[in-house]
Every structure is written in structure tokens, then in C-alpha cells.
UniProtKB/Swiss-Prot annotation:
Belongs to the protein kinase superfamily. Ser/Thr protein kinase family. WEE1 subfamily. It comes from the Eukaryota. This is Membrane-associated tyrosine- and threonine-specific cdc2-inhibitory kinase wee-1.3. It is a peripheral membrane protein. GO terms for molecular function: ATP binding; metal ion binding; protein kinase activity; protein serine kinase activity; protein serine/threonine kinase activity. Residues 1-24, 449-552, 617-656 are annotated as: Disordered. The active site is at D227 (proton acceptor). Disulfide bonds: none annotated. It comes from Caenorhabditis briggsae. Residues 1-11, 486-505, 646-656 have a biased composition (Polar residues). Transmembrane segments: none annotated. SUPFAM superfamilies: Protein kinase-like (PK-like) (SSF56112).
Length: 656
């Protein structure tokens, strides 16, 4: 035997017995781009092709359609498509004066779920019932006299409803475009298979039974789908298959549909359709290829030798690994090249493997429909109950809300009326100002001339409550002092009227202090305490240089001082009776300690300059003991009331 007989990698050339031996050359390899791609699965094809593939650009007409100036302008009013002709479309959410279309006004677009040669499919929520629908919108404007103008909409309306067909709601025309509103499913079979790849056989049987029921329903009504493929098969949330997209449906009762029949997708097209017209057997062939793709994850070719290989039944055995013999036999019968040898939909339903699963599948679909209906009913009842309760309890909730709002206003008003207590005047309190003036706090906040800041001494521009400064100083002896000192202003203005002013001018009405937190040094004497300890003659005059007048002035000073002491005692008594046990502000001296420190003598002022002076011999002064300092009497001489009282205005005992 020649060595080259079994060599498949070189060309064998037959030569005669007398001819010389010809050297065989290796066969020229065929480029990869020109090789015929064998049958493969989708996973294998994805491994050979790049992950990202740019989609083909859409055809867009950049030049607008030219119209004659004499052409009649078309009406843009939406027209409802019905079997008896177009009718006017109405909706409570549609406004004719609005420039938006009926679809944009009545529906709220969520996303685009599909694109095709006919148009785009949107997932939109209807504002009339707040439910999601699938709305298919044609891309190109429809021709006025086209025979297939309402073909898909009419097919939906002619076909009786079925549980395995996509439910149709309505269709309308607007601005030469057709809108079809149908049921919204969860995903298509193509999307489901691209994620799951080879499906379990139990799911394959369920898909097979559902699609067979849909095809049988169409064939029993003399309808041919002519476009059965995974892209037009939809799955619900309960994994129930439904057949949709009736754009190429052929009604055998309508001669126009038979004449204008179009071919579907070439991947799932029966071979006899290339030379003829679609039939019931062509739908069975498309259904068989669809089940084959779902069961084996086969990458179905659209043309070439692989396309004919499937039509001839030359499918490798490796694709049927793990598939039962019953399912394989049914698939091979359905994709038979001869249309007469293919089983009909009625014959497939009578098959033993399908008949046993048909009843269980019907019960499952019925139970899911009952479950969805019960859920919708309960949700409707719940909504009505909530509406009823809201109507019943709405007045109660409004009343309760009004009470809470009023309570909040009162609390906020009380908090806002709480005056800030200055740090330097801890003796004042909320009740103190009312006891001093007898006026409510709310009214006091409007007419008080003080700014109640942390500083006890207000600015000079705001001290308008008292009279002008005195022209003379009132001097008292040390023996006239008492525990309680008369108050006066901490500034240059004084609260004590001079003798000359009091005798020469009539008494002016005293303006009461009506602000909470008034410092003790700014108190105004109440008129009721003026004449408590004695009265004086308003006609009496004091001379400037007369000795008799000086004695009278001394007596008048003494009487006035006694009256001031009585007024201070009365005010302190009111403070004690209306005292509220409040925590003293931080960095301030408690009132009890201040009162106890008033009786103690003042601390001596240390003069450190004496230490720097040289001490002369013979003139050394004895050092004064601390005990003597504590027992040293206060300085004699005249001292004004303002300077004496200013020493007790500090908040701590060590102030000078």
C-alpha cells in the first residue's frame, strides 16, 4: 500500500504505472474567514466572538417629506382602531390643547424593552389605572392606502383571547403612527435562554406545551403566525409562555392577507416557504426549531450549509446529550424537510408525553390566575378600606393635630417669654419683676427701656427711666448706715431727687419698671412709699447760706434716707415672699452670701508703693496688726450715696 493513501493532509494524484512518482504537496489551508462555520452552541459562539459588538446603525431619513402647498393638513386627533372602523379616543388625562401626544399624556414611559424593524416597544405605566403595559409604536409613518395599515391590530382583535397568547387591550392611530397596547411580560424566551443556556428538560416540556396550545388555538381559527421565534415568545413571572407579535399573522379567510404574506426570520423559516407560501406546517417547523434551540442551546444559523444541515436533519449527536428520546423524536418530526411528514398541532396534543403533561399544566395556569385574581381583589379591598378609614378618622386626626399645634404654640410662647437673667444680678427672678411692678411679663417685654444683656450696667443711651443727675451730693454719717442701703443707678444718673428740685418743681409721675430681670440698682421708688414716714411742706424753701435752712436740710435728708430704707425693706420683703428656688447662674455669688457679706467691713486696699520708699531712721511707723485692721472703723467724712452704694453692687465679695 502506498504511504499517501491514508494521508488526508496532502493531495493524492493518480498516475499510471509507467509514469514517474509525483511528489505530493500539502493542501493549501483555507483561511479562517472563508471556512464554513459548523454547528455550535451559543456558549461556543460567545467564546469565539468578541464580548462587545457595536449594533448596526439605524436608517434615519434626514430629508423631510416634501408636501404640496395645496395638500390638506392631516388631523392629529388620536383615533381608536376598532373592527368597525376608527373612532374618537377619549381619556380624562388627555388634553387636546396640549402639544404632547396621547401616549405621552396618558402614559408614563419607564424604559424601552425592545426594538425591531416595525417599531419600538415601551414599558409604560398608564395614568388611568396605574398599571404597567407594553406599548408598541411604529417607527415609519403608515401609508394612507396601505393594505397592512392596521394588520397587526386587526389580528389582535380577530383572534379570540387565550391564556397562552399575549393579551391585547387597545390600539390607536395618531400622527400617522400606530400604537398597540398589550400585556407586559417579565422577559422574552431569548433573554431567558441567553442567561440559562441549556434549560432543564422539565422546563422544556412546559414551554413546549404552552407554545403548542397557542399554535393550536391559532390554527383552529384559521390563522398562521408565520413568525414563531424566541424573540416573540414571552415569559410571565410564573414562567408561563405566551406567544405575541402578530405583525405577520396571516388570516386564511382574508384573501388579501394570503396575497401579501411575508417571510419571517430566516433562522426559523421552513424550506418550502422559500418557493411557496406559509402554511400550518411552516408554523410547526418554526416551533420545532425553537424547542431545539431551547433544549440544546444551539446557535441557529441564518444561512449557509449549516442552515441546510438542520433542514436535512444532520444534527450531531453531541447536542442531544441529556435529552430524553421522546423529546428528541418529537423535535425530529417537527423539523422534517417534508411538510407532509410533519405532525399537526392536533396530533402533537394527542401524543402520550404531551397529553400527560397537558392537564397538569392547565391546572397550574388556572391556579396562578386564581392567585393573581385573589391578590388583585385583596389589594382593591385594602385600598377601599384605607379610603373609608381615612374619611372616618380624618376629622379626628385634624382635631388632634390642632390640639398638638396649639400646645406647641403655648409651649413655644412660654419658652420665648422666659427672660434672660443677667449674671451680675442673681437676686432677680421671674416673679420678682411682677411683684415689683404688678404688670404681666408679656406686657412688660414691649415697654421696658432696658436691654437685658449679661452686663448689669446698660448703655447710657438706654437709661431713660430716671431723672437727670443731682446737682449736689448727699452726705451721711457713718452712724446712719444700716444693713440695707438705698439703691441708685450704677451710672451717672441718680434715682434720688435733690431738695431744690423737689421743692421747686411739682412731683412727676413715676414710671414703673415692667421688665423681668431689672437689676436692684435700677429700682424706682414706688410713690406709695414716699409719704410713709412723714410729709413735708411743698411751700418750704431752703436757703443757700442760712444756718436755719441747713438744719432743715439735714433733717430732710434724714427723713428721706429713712423713707428709702423703708422702701428697700418693703421691696426686699416682696422679693423674699415671691422668691423661687432657682439655681444661681454660673460665675455669680449666691444672694445669701451677699447679704451676709454686707455687714462685714470692707477689705483694706494694699499700697505696695510704700515698700519702695526708703525708711528713715527714727521715723519708723509701727506695723498695724491684722486684728487692728479688722477692728479699724470706717473712714470719717462725707461720702456720696452713689459712691457708698457702688461698693455693694459687685457680684462677689472681693470687689472694690
Amino acid at each position: 500500500m502506498d504511504e499517501t493513501e491514508n494521508n488526508t493532509s496532502i493531495d493524492s494524484v493518480e498516475v499510471g504505472p509507467s509514469s514517474p512518482r509525483v511528489v505530493a504537496t500539502p493542501r493549501i489551508p483555507i483561511p479562517v474567514m472563508m471556512r464554513e462555520t459548523p454547528l455550535s452552541t451559543k456558549r461556543e459562539r460567545q467564546a469565539l466572538t468578541p464580548r462587545f459588538r457595536r449594533p448596526a446603525p439605524r436608517m434615519i431619513k434626514t430629508v423631510p417629506q416634501t408636501r404640496s402647498i395645496w395638500s390638506v393638513r392631516k388631523d392629529t386627533t388620536p383615533q381608536l382602531v376598532t373592527p368597525h372602523g376608527p373612532q374618537e379616543l377619549e381619556s380624562p388625562h388627555y388634553d387636546r390643547a396640549n402639544t404632547q401626544t396621547f401616549f405621552e399624556q396618558v402614559f408614563q414611559i419607564d424604559e424601552i424593552i425592545g426594538r425591531g424593524s416595525f417599531g419600538e416597544v415601551f414599558a409604560a405605566r398608564c395614568r388611568e389605572d396605574s398599571r404597567l403595559y407594553a406599548v408598541k409604536v411604529s417607527i415609519a409613518p403608515m401609508r394612507q392606502h396601505s393594505m397592512s395599515k392596521y394588520r397587526e391590530a386587526e389580528s389582535h382583535m380577530i383572534i379570540p383571547p387565550h391564556k397562552n397568547l399575549v393579551k391585547f387591550y387597545r390600539a390607536w392611530e395618531e400622527t400617522d403612527r400606530l400604537y398597540i397596547q398589550t400585556e407586559l411580560c417579565e422577559q422574552s424566551l431569548q433573554q431567558y435562554c441567553s442567561v440559562q443556556h441549556a434549560l432543564p428538560e422539565n422546563e422544556i416540556w412546559n414551554i413546549f406545551v404552552d407554545l403548542l396550545e397557542a399554535v393550536h388555538h391559532l390554527h383552529s381559527n384559521d390563522m398562521i403566525h408565520d413568525d414563531i421565534k424566541p424573540e416573540n415568545i414571552f415569559l410571565t413571572k410564573h414562567k408561563i409562555c405566551k406567544l405575541g407579535d402578530f405583525g405577520l399573522v396571516i388570516n386564511l379567510k382574508n384573501p388579501n392577507d394570503v396575497k401579501s404574506a411575508e417571510e419571517g426570520d430566516s433562522k426559523y423559516l421552513a424550506p418550502e416557504v422559500l418557493n411557496g407560501k406559509p402554511t400550518f406546517a411552516s408554523d410547526i417547523f418554526s416551533l420545532g426549531v425553537t424547542i431545539l434551540e431551547a433544549a440544546t442551546d444551539l446557535d441557529v444559523p441564518s444561512n449557509g450549509d449549516a442552515w441546510h444541515q438542520i433542514r436535512n436533519g444532520q444534527i450531531p449527536e453531541r447536542f442531544f446529550v441529556g435529552i430524553s428520546s421522546d423529546l428528541r423524536v418529537l423535535i425530529e418530526q417537527m423539523i422534517n424537510k417534508e411538510p407532509m411528514k410533519r405532525p399537526t398541532s392536533d396530533a402533537l396534543r394527542k401524543h402520550l408525553s404531551i397529553r400527560t403533561r397537558l392537564d397538569s399544566r392547565r391546572r397550574y395556569i388556572l391556579s396562578m390566575d386564581m392567585r393573581d385574581g385573589f391578590c388583585n381583589l385583596m389589594s382593591s379591598i385594602l385600598v377601599w378600606c384605607m379610603a373609608f378609614l381615612s374619611v372616618v378618622f380624618h376629622p379626628v386626626t385634624r382635631f388632634h393635630e390642632a390640639i398638638n399645634n396649639r400646645r406647641s404654640e403655648l409651649c413655644a410662647q412660654f419658652v420665648n417669654n422666659q427672660q434672660h437673667t443677667p449674671i451680675q444680678t442673681p437676686e432677680t427672678s421671674k416673679v420678682y419683676s411682677e411683684s415689683l411692678t404688678g404688670v404681666a411679663l408679656r406686657q412688660a417685654s414691649q415697654i421696658s427701656p432696658f436691654d437685658f444683656s449679661d452686663d448689669e450696667n446698660p448703655p447710657h443711651s438706654q437709661r431713660r427711666l430716671f431723672t437727670g443727675p443731682v446737682s449736689r451730693r448727699l452726705n451721711f454719717d457713718d452712724e446712719m448706715e444700716d444693713e440695707e442701703q438705698a439703691t441708685c443707678s450704677s451710672s451717672n444718673s441718680s434715682a434720688i431727687e435733690t431738695a431744690e428740685d423737689s421743692l421747686s418743681s411739682p412731683k412727676k409721675p413715676v414710671i414703673p419698671v415692667t421688665r423681668q430681670g431689672t437689676p436692684k440698682s435700677a429700682r424706682r421708688l414706688i410713690p406709695s412709699y414716699r409719704n410713709r414716714s412723714g410729709s413735708r411742706d411743698p411751700t418750704h424753701h431752703a436757703g443757700a447760706g442760712d444756718s436755719m435752712n441747713s438744719s432743715i436740710l439735714d433733717q430732710e435728708r434724714t427723713d428721706r434716707y429713712l423713707r428709702m430704707r423703708l422702701a428697700e425693706q418693703q421691696l426686699d420683703w416682696n422679693d423674699h415672699s415671691n422668691m423661687i428656688d432657682e439655681a444661681p447662674p454660673p460665675m455669680s455669688c449666691p444672694p445669701r452670701i451677699r447679704r451676709s457679706l454686707r455687714d462685714m467691713p470692707r477689705m483694706p486696699v494694699l499700697n505696695f508703693n510704700l515698700l519702695d520708699e526708703p525708711i528713715k531712721k527714727g521715723k519708723e511707723k509701727p506695723v498695724v496688726e491684722p486684728a487692728e485692721l479688722r477692728q479699724r472703723p470706717m473712714r470719717n467724712g462725707l461720702k456720696s450715696l452713689r459712691s457708698r452704694m457702688a461698693s455693694f453692687q459687685g457680684s462677689s465679695g472681693d470687689e472694690n
